[in-house]
Amino acid sequence: MSLSATQLKALEDSVLNTSGKVLLHDRVRALFTLKSLKNEDAIRIISKGFQDSAALLKHELAYCLGQIRNPLALPVLESVLRNPSEDPMVRHEAAEAMGAISTADSIPILKQYLSDPDRSVRETCEIAIAKIEWDKTEEGAKNDKATRDENRLPLYTSIDPAPATSGLLTGAPRPEEISQTKIDELRDNLLDVNRPLFERYRAMFALRNIGSPAAVDALAAGFSGDSALFKHEIAFVFGQLLSPHSVPCLIEVLQNSPESDMVRHEAAEALGGIATPEVLPPLKEWVARDDAPVVVRESCQVALDLWEYENSGDFQYANGLESPSTPISV
């Protein structure tokens, strides 16, 4: 995909909201349009957005830089991680993006934050280090080669914070990998707090790749834990799976005011992607509620835009060069 200078400027103006009139969900659409370019222009424009005040947007900026997977993005991501005044949700995403880009030079920097005051930042750095180290193993190198194969049809195109467990790394799961016995084993590994987080994440993404209702139930059991990072990743996985079977637990998470904003935000966006009729009332409720945390309210706004896209028949969500959408009615 190649864009003219005029088109790039239009996307930049949308993402950075230079007019002050661009709705958040339109900024996100423009951002994901840039992400799809996977080039230096996209990195340059996305990197400018960290001056914004919106934590949700900056978290999405960091995510997109990681998914572009270009070391040119590392300086800005390192700067975000090092900034103690930045929202922890943004710093965590910067660390995760460094893991996605996966250069050995990032390991010493990530190690500096293994004792960060914020738990989600500490845990993300732990997982990112383990991922970079795994990527350098024989299994990791083989998987990297497979993921870069243009002829491959992956189950998911995302660069995940941890690979699925062996046997469920790529391609459709074999029958022996989706048995109830295997799901129970993965569930046990997912919930075992004595295991390294990286290994628990591997079980999480293996269950995602299985994708059955039983696998969804196993993943949902992870919402009972005390790690906001872990629970937010489960909600993210549900947003990839798009299984209506996950809707009840995601609504419960969104409605749970004592839950971390980071977890509720991810639950909201997952609901928007699933886009069944029953997700609309809670999303509209939390857009309108005066007591909704900013990140939760904004995530519901983005989720409603996702819902409208999924139910519109439009071909492409990342259509940031089209006319801005109208405000979402609540």
From Swiss-Prot:
<feature type="binding site">
    <location>
        <position position="92"/>
    </location>
    <ligand>
        <name>Fe cation 1</name>
    </ligand>
</feature>
<dbReference type="InterPro" id="IPR027517">
    <property type="entry name" value="Deoxyhypusine_hydroxylase"/>
</dbReference>
<dbReference type="GO" id="GO:0005737">
    <property type="term" value="C:cytoplasm"/>
</dbReference>
<keyword id="KW-0479">Metal-binding</keyword>
<dbReference type="GO" id="GO:0046872">
    <property type="term" value="F:metal ion binding"/>
</dbReference>
<keyword id="KW-0677">Repeat</keyword>
<keyword id="KW-0963">Cytoplasm</keyword>
<feature type="binding site">
    <location>
        <position position="265"/>
    </location>
    <ligand>
        <name>Fe cation 2</name>
    </ligand>
</feature>
<feature type="repeat" description="HEAT-like PBS-type 3">
    <location>
        <begin position="199"/>
        <end position="225"/>
    </location>
</feature>
<feature type="binding site">
    <location>
        <position position="266"/>
    </location>
    <ligand>
        <name>Fe cation 2</name>
    </ligand>
</feature>
<keyword id="KW-0539">Nucleus</keyword>
<comment type="pathway">
    <text>Protein modification; eIF5A hypusination.</text>
</comment>
<comment type="similarity">
    <text>Belongs to the deoxyhypusine hydroxylase family.</text>
</comment>
<keyword id="KW-0560">Oxidoreductase</keyword>
<keyword id="KW-0408">Iron</keyword>
<dbReference type="InterPro" id="IPR016024">
    <property type="entry name" value="ARM-type_fold"/>
</dbReference>
<dbReference type="InterPro" id="IPR021133">
    <property type="entry name" value="HEAT_type_2"/>
</dbReference>
<comment type="function">
    <text>Catalyzes the hydroxylation of the N(6)-(4-aminobutyl)-L-lysine intermediate to form hypusine, an essential post-translational modification only found in mature eIF-5A factor.</text>
</comment>
<keyword id="KW-0503">Monooxygenase</keyword>
<dbReference type="Pfam" id="PF13646">
    <property type="entry name" value="HEAT_2"/>
</dbReference>
<feature type="binding site">
    <location>
        <position position="232"/>
    </location>
    <ligand>
        <name>Fe cation 2</name>
    </ligand>
</feature>
<keyword id="KW-0386">Hypusine biosynthesis</keyword>
<dbReference type="GO" id="GO:0019135">
    <property type="term" value="F:deoxyhypusine monooxygenase activity"/>
</dbReference>
<dbReference type="GO" id="GO:0005634">
    <property type="term" value="C:nucleus"/>
</dbReference>
<dbReference type="InterPro" id="IPR011989">
    <property type="entry name" value="ARM-like"/>
</dbReference>
<feature type="binding site">
    <location>
        <position position="60"/>
    </location>
    <ligand>
        <name>Fe cation 1</name>
    </ligand>
</feature>
<feature type="repeat" description="HEAT-like PBS-type 1">
    <location>
        <begin position="57"/>
        <end position="83"/>
    </location>
</feature>
<dbReference type="InterPro" id="IPR004155">
    <property type="entry name" value="PBS_lyase_HEAT"/>
</dbReference>
<feature type="binding site">
    <location>
        <position position="93"/>
    </location>
    <ligand>
        <name>Fe cation 1</name>
    </ligand>
</feature>
<feature type="repeat" description="HEAT-like PBS-type 4">
    <location>
        <begin position="263"/>
        <end position="289"/>
    </location>
</feature>
<protein>
    <recommendedName>
        <fullName>Deoxyhypusine hydroxylase</fullName>
        <ecNumber>1.14.99.29</ecNumber>
    </recommendedName>
</protein>
<feature type="repeat" description="HEAT-like PBS-type 2">
    <location>
        <begin position="90"/>
        <end position="116"/>
    </location>
</feature>
<feature type="binding site">
    <location>
        <position position="59"/>
    </location>
    <ligand>
        <name>Fe cation 1</name>
    </ligand>
</feature>
<feature type="binding site">
    <location>
        <position position="233"/>
    </location>
    <ligand>
        <name>Fe cation 2</name>
    </ligand>
</feature>
